[in-house]
Amino acid sequence: MIENNICIVGLGLMGGSYAMALTKAGKQVTAIDKNSESITYAEQSGIIECGKTEDYERLLGEADAVVFALYPHAFIDFVRDNQKYFKSGVIITDVTGVKSNVVEPIQSFLREDAEFIPCHPMAGREVSGVEFADDSIFKGANFIITPTEKNTARGLDFAYNLAHLLGVFHISELSVEQHD
């Protein structure tokens, strides 16, 4: 089973495609993005229930899971600056393609009652923006989970269930070093 209330941070192609797939699966999906036009488009298109560009503390506090679709440095900064709003027991994951520069930094400061399970869907297109969101990009794709010693059975279960919900073709587990 996958958590019901999921917040997507970063509504580009990947974040929007995750949101679309999760919404179609009946999850309550909210989003945070710096671009108000992206939020408006996603709300009006039914990709998300609601979104914010600022004053998003409530969205983070209500989320059972948070998916980060940001560049690595922005991902690290966002978690560092906003983890105080995460609910206890939250699972966070990402879509970044290089793990060595995000996993250790995030895990070095992440609260003890939050879990980061690194993931990388091997999917995408040569376009960007939520207006190109398409949950079918995951069909036939590989999905890599890079668990660490800090991950629990619950976190791994979340990652596998997320991958199945997205409809990926193959799921593999690799170490951070093997992935990069």
Q: Which positions does each model-derived feature cover?
A:
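Hydrophobic Val/Ile/Leu positions in short beta-strands of Rossmann-like dinucleotide-binding domains
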Residues: 7-8, 68, 145
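Phosphate-coordination loops involved in phosphoryl transfer and adenosine-cofactor binding
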Residues: 2-5, 89, 140
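Short beta->alpha hinge that forms the Motif I/post-I loop of the SAM-binding pocket
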Residues: 34, 70, 95
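NAD(P)+-binding Rossmann beta1-loop-alpha1 motif at the extreme N-terminus of oxidoreductases
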Residues: 1-58
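Rossmann-like NAD(P)(H) cofactor-binding subdomain of soluble oxidoreductases
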Residues: 80-130
